[in-house]
Amino acid sequence: MSAQQQKNLSESAQVDQQSVQPFPRSQKVYVQGSRPDIRVPMREISLDVTPTDFGGEINAPVTVYDTSGPYTDPNVTIDVRKGLSDVRSAWIEDRGDTEKLPGLSSEFGQRRLNDAELSAMRFAHVRNPRRARAGHNVSQMHYAKKGIITPEMEFVAIRENMKLAEAREAGLLNEQHAGHSFGASIPKEITPEFVRSEVARGRAIIPANINHVELEPMIIGRNFLVKINGNIGNSALGSSIEEEVAKLTWGIRWGSDTVMDLSTGKHIHETREWIIRNSPVPIGTVPIYQALEKVGGIAEDLTWELFRDTLIEQAEQGVDYFTIHAGVLLRYVPLTAKRVTGIVSRGGSIMAKWCLAHHKENFLYTHFEDICEIMKAYDVSFSLGDGLRPGSIADANDAAQFGELETLGELTKIAWKHDVQCMIEGPGHVPMQLIKENMDKQLECCDEAPFYTLGPLTTDIAPGYDHITSGIGAAMIGWFGCAMLCYVTPKEHLGLPNKDDVKTGIITYKIAAHAADLAKGHPGAQIRDNALSKARFEFRWEDQFNLGLDPDTARAFHDETLPKDSAKVAHFCSMCGPKFCSMKITQEVRDYAKEQRIDAVDLDAEQGMQAKAAEFKAQGSQLYQKV
């Protein structure tokens, strides 16, 4: 995008048209809570009737979790220049513990606002920020500890259940394998009280800054559905504000539960405002990235005062969680010297360099309680960064990684003392046999605070395919108890991801998260699998496509060899053809048995006898065989 186009963004910005298309045979449904303004969005997939001898068997619609916000609702007009509608202001105002500020508090925010050259690119509909009244704490954890069920908690409970009671009544929960949850306590139904208790205990967080009023609340915790995060952000090498907003809307269409804005290039402040105002999902950032930009990229010049102003700037915009690398301590840095890949975290390397340059302890660590004071005034959640995570499987589970993890556990308890919500970031690159140890160590050190991992990548030999190497580890650690998985795209280690890469990474991680939910035995997790399997056996091709995580790709693959509409009702696919389709043959056997009134058990027994007879003849009809 040219400088002139970027300059006129406030007039020209348009929503990404691909992101606002409703999914095929799907409709947006809203489940109302205890008050009219609690309207929880879900996606309902309609299914075709199964033909029978008696007119047809109705297949109940399948309800699925929906992260796309109003973008896929055809009844909503989207204008990214105005942002999304307000969801939460009434809830926040009703609590009576916040105040509207006359303007921005941060010095940097004020300077950007007064810079006339930025006026055309600036988001035009900025509200005055809100902050806790003096002496008040406005975090969801604070309310939860006081026994208060907030509208956000009720919203989350309804959302996690996905009409579970209706599914149970319809008998859709009868066919699900028992899971193994490794100590997680997943109830048969998620209630608002259960949400409150998990947030109060620190086992779950609801990232929901009071200045992100467009947010549709969600929850991150091991006793809830496994979530995924997608990363976006510009850099000095390119990408525009409009492209980043398009990546946001594209990512949440395919299932990104949260989005991190990792921008490091120009106009970080303006980019973030556009993203938050158009985001129905929580937005996370790494504030040290912007702080570094403010000092010209020289880590040694960072100061606590500058960083504090950056936290306030971002909190007043509405960032829901901050990655803070407060566990990178001076004494841990030498432990990385003999690593194959050293320190690979950007935030970790920045703070390590600062510590060595000044030979002082990490100022994020020494000022941690000061940071807590800011967080609880806006309800920003901690995502305690793993600045010493392994960047290769050779470095996995070493002294530096686990030393930092122990420190993150100490910091978690300090955050909880201030009633600040907190999750813990994890690796990284870990071979499969060491993944369980990571999860167990985190649960032990951090007292079950939610774990949030990047993968982990299980091997280092597949550049271009690291969405797969990491998807393997993500599924495993999600099963073991990890609450949120940060996606990896095919471009990992190679370049900045484009829209296609974002989609590939998200779909890969939706598979991993869902596989983990199945393995944990999350109630209702298997409903969609069962519906798709039934559609596959009955050759309901459109239902197969629409029930999948990516209907577009499934339909395109089918149409590569069978493009005609008539193929959408064919009782075979292009892999086996009409004569060798196992499911078609099975249906014919069933039909034959029905016509001949042969019991299925008898038919199976007869087929087994015939198979054994053929095996006996093939071995030479000898009564005894040599061994």
Swiss-Prot record:
<comment type="function">
    <text>Catalyzes the synthesis of the hydroxymethylpyrimidine phosphate (HMP-P) moiety of thiamine from aminoimidazole ribotide (AIR) in a radical S-adenosyl-L-methionine (SAM)-dependent reaction.</text>
</comment>
<keyword id="KW-0408">Iron</keyword>
<dbReference type="InterPro" id="IPR038521">
    <property type="entry name" value="ThiC/Bza_core_dom"/>
</dbReference>
<comment type="pathway">
    <text>Cofactor biosynthesis; thiamine diphosphate biosynthesis.</text>
</comment>
<keyword id="KW-0004">4Fe-4S</keyword>
<feature type="binding site">
    <location>
        <position position="576"/>
    </location>
    <ligand>
        <name>[4Fe-4S] cluster</name>
    </ligand>
</feature>
<dbReference type="GO" id="GO:0009228">
    <property type="term" value="P:thiamine biosynthetic process"/>
</dbReference>
<dbReference type="Pfam" id="PF01964">
    <property type="entry name" value="ThiC_Rad_SAM"/>
</dbReference>
<keyword id="KW-0411">Iron-sulfur</keyword>
<dbReference type="GO" id="GO:0009229">
    <property type="term" value="P:thiamine diphosphate biosynthetic process"/>
</dbReference>
<dbReference type="Pfam" id="PF13667">
    <property type="entry name" value="ThiC-associated"/>
</dbReference>
<dbReference type="InterPro" id="IPR037509">
    <property type="entry name" value="ThiC"/>
</dbReference>
<comment type="similarity">
    <text>Belongs to the ThiC family.</text>
</comment>
<keyword id="KW-0862">Zinc</keyword>
<dbReference type="GO" id="GO:0051539">
    <property type="term" value="F:4 iron, 4 sulfur cluster binding"/>
</dbReference>
<comment type="subunit">
    <text>Homodimer.</text>
</comment>
<feature type="binding site">
    <location>
        <position position="429"/>
    </location>
    <ligand>
        <name>Zn(2+)</name>
    </ligand>
</feature>
<protein>
    <recommendedName>
        <fullName>Phosphomethylpyrimidine synthase</fullName>
        <ecNumber>4.1.99.17</ecNumber>
    </recommendedName>
</protein>
<feature type="region of interest" description="Disordered">
    <location>
        <begin position="1"/>
        <end position="32"/>
    </location>
</feature>
<keyword id="KW-0479">Metal-binding</keyword>
<feature type="binding site">
    <location>
        <position position="425"/>
    </location>
    <ligand>
        <name>substrate</name>
    </ligand>
</feature>
<feature type="binding site">
    <location>
        <position position="493"/>
    </location>
    <ligand>
        <name>Zn(2+)</name>
    </ligand>
</feature>
<feature type="binding site">
    <location>
        <position position="325"/>
    </location>
    <ligand>
        <name>substrate</name>
    </ligand>
</feature>
<dbReference type="GO" id="GO:0008270">
    <property type="term" value="F:zinc ion binding"/>
</dbReference>
<keyword id="KW-0949">S-adenosyl-L-methionine</keyword>
<dbReference type="InterPro" id="IPR002817">
    <property type="entry name" value="ThiC/BzaA/B"/>
</dbReference>
<dbReference type="GO" id="GO:0016830">
    <property type="term" value="F:carbon-carbon lyase activity"/>
</dbReference>
<keyword id="KW-0456">Lyase</keyword>
<keyword id="KW-0784">Thiamine biosynthesis</keyword>
<dbReference type="InterPro" id="IPR025747">
    <property type="entry name" value="ThiC-associated_dom"/>
</dbReference>
<feature type="binding site">
    <location>
        <position position="289"/>
    </location>
    <ligand>
        <name>substrate</name>
    </ligand>
</feature>
<feature type="binding site">
    <location>
        <begin position="345"/>
        <end position="347"/>
    </location>
    <ligand>
        <name>substrate</name>
    </ligand>
</feature>
<feature type="binding site">
    <location>
        <begin position="386"/>
        <end position="389"/>
    </location>
    <ligand>
        <name>substrate</name>
    </ligand>
</feature>
<feature type="binding site">
    <location>
        <position position="581"/>
    </location>
    <ligand>
        <name>[4Fe-4S] cluster</name>
    </ligand>
</feature>
<feature type="binding site">
    <location>
        <position position="452"/>
    </location>
    <ligand>
        <name>substrate</name>
    </ligand>
</feature>
<feature type="binding site">
    <location>
        <position position="231"/>
    </location>
    <ligand>
        <name>substrate</name>
    </ligand>
</feature>
<dbReference type="GO" id="GO:0005829">
    <property type="term" value="C:cytosol"/>
</dbReference>
<feature type="compositionally biased region" description="Polar residues">
    <location>
        <begin position="1"/>
        <end position="21"/>
    </location>
</feature>
<feature type="binding site">
    <location>
        <position position="573"/>
    </location>
    <ligand>
        <name>[4Fe-4S] cluster</name>
    </ligand>
</feature>
<feature type="binding site">
    <location>
        <position position="260"/>
    </location>
    <ligand>
        <name>substrate</name>
    </ligand>
</feature>
